[in-house]
């Protein structure tokens, strides 16, 4: 099974990055301005995108501030169903955050996998920028 694995630095503290991942305002700052964002393990985050006929439904598996956010995809495009997404956040001694991003469990490295890989790279750059500056630049702005 192919996986998407990325590592990048953010010039913001882990708690700031964590809030960008786990709050409605945070997700609206870098991913989508239309999202339902509960905060408890077992609840489902629902993210919408323009022209998409469905929401991306992500069950919260772990939400340990400020170290880890993990989701399990329970709704969305067929290629996403039963995949797992995790954001590991580590404090850098010199300041800032080391982000370890995993999106695991794709069935095959098909065209959709390649598209998702490309878009995650683009979107995660927006996450870093938002956490560093506080200026929203969402991927999907309704």
Describe the residue ranges of each PLM region.
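Charge-dense, helix-prone N-terminal extensions
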Residues: 1-3, 15-16, 45, 55-57, ...
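Alpha-helical scaffold segments that form or flank carboxylate-/histidine-based iron centers
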Residues: 13, 47-48, 115, 142
């Amino acid at each position: 099974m192919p996986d998407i694995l990325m590592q990048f630095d953010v010039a913001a503290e882990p708690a700031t990055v964590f809030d960008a991942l786990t709050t409605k305002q945070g997700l609206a700052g870098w991913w989508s301005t239309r999202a339902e964002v509960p905060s408890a393990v077992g609840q489902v985050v629902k993210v919408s995108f323009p022209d998409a006929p469905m929401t991306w439904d992500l069950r919260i598996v772990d939400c340990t501030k400020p170290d880890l956010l993990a989701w399990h995809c329970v709704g969305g495009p067929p290629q996403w169903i039963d995949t797992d997404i995790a954001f590991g956040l580590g404090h850098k001694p010199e300041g800032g955050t080391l982000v370890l991003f995993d999106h695991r469990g794709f069935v095959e490295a098909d065209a959709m996998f390649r598209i998702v890989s490309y878009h995650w790279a683009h979107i995660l750059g927006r996450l870093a920028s938002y956490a560093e500056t506080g200026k929203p630049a969402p991927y999907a702005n309704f």
